[in-house]
């Protein structure tokens, strides 16, 4: 993206960190097909986030929590906020007597249409989550990712057969239902920069009354990290210790991911300035990476 300036004249991209667990619960607590979404708690009203709970087959429940990385308090631990979420009586009552069988986490691209980069470059096309086709209000992106992949495949065939330029991919995308869906959802995420209450009110007006067709588009004014405040200006957060029944620590959670890698695998994160973590992020922000990292 940087090399080919694919983000030129686009809003800064927005990100979130998402957590997901699969539970096998008691039959009397299971309602196959039930879908639940929540917003807010345990986060404060200035922090963007919400949950999903899907009752699947075989007495399984998929539950997760997504937190926007534009939060202000560097002491916040997204993983621990997710664990705390499960202690709410409405959620705990579903999980009690059950067993956690899987855990996972991943970064999400939340910027939507305003931050969508140019989707073509010499010899390559951007599709799915690499481009940022997630529908953030619905926390769904598999369907849009697959459709963008199908459009990319059509473009490649046209390019090889008829020597049509790869730029036709973006034209196809803008004529598809994916673009229409992302356009309708474009104002939801940026509206929550005003806080939870105003964000919900605006989203209700935008999505329910106007069906995402308001005659203006809200902007993402800056990158996520710009909102982070110095550690000394924000209150520390005291998270309860895990009970290993409903809530768990990171170590036992990572064990359930099933991931593996070679011991000598090269480190994929490269520091431009090795002094920066100590002299800047640790000193000013109490090194938030030790908390936002999900493993």
Regions found by a protein language model. Give the residues of each.
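Residues forming the flavin
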Residues: 1-217, 261-267, 276-277, 281-294
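Long, low-complexity segments enriched in small/aliphatic residues
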Residues: 200-261
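Intrinsic low-complexity, disordered N-terminal segments enriched in polar/charged/small residues
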Residues: 271-272
């Amino acid at each position: 993206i940087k090399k080919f300036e694919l983000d030129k004249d686009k809003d800064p991209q927005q990100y979130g960190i998402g957590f997901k667990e699969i539970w096998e619960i008691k039959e009397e607590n299971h309602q196959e097909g039930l879908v639940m979404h929540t917003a807010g708690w345990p986060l404060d009203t200035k922090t963007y986030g919400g949950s999903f709970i899907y009752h699947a087959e075989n007495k399984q429940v998929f539950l997760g929590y997504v937190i926007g990385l534009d939060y202000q308090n560097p002491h916040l631990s997204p993983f621990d906020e997710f664990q705390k979420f499960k202690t709410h009586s409405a959620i705990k009552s579903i999980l009690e007597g059950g067993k956690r069988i899987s855990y996972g986490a991943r970064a999400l691209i939340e910027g939507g249409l305003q931050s969508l980069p140019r989707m073509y470059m010499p010899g390559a096309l951007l599709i799915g989550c690499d481009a940022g086709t997630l529908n953030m209000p619905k926390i769904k992106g598999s369907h849009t990712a697959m459709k963008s992949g199908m459009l990319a495949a059509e473009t490649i065939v046209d390019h090889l057969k008829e020597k049509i330029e790869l730029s036709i991919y973006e034209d196809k995308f803008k004529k598809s239902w994916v673009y229409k869906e992302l356009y309708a959802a474009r104002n939801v995420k940026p509206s929550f920069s005003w806080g939870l209450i105003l964000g919900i009110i605006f989203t209700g007006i935008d999505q329910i009354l106007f069906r995402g067709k308001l005659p203006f588009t809200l902007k993402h004014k800056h990158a996520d990290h710009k909102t982070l405040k110095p550690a000394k200006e924000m209150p520390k957060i005291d998270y309860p210790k895990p009970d290993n029944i409903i809530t768990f620590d990171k170590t036992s959670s990572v064990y359930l991911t099933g991931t593996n890698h070679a011991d000598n695998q090269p480190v994929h994160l490269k520091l431009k300035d090795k002094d920066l973590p100590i002299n800047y992020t640790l000193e000013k922000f109490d090194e938030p990476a030790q908390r936002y990292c999900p493993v």
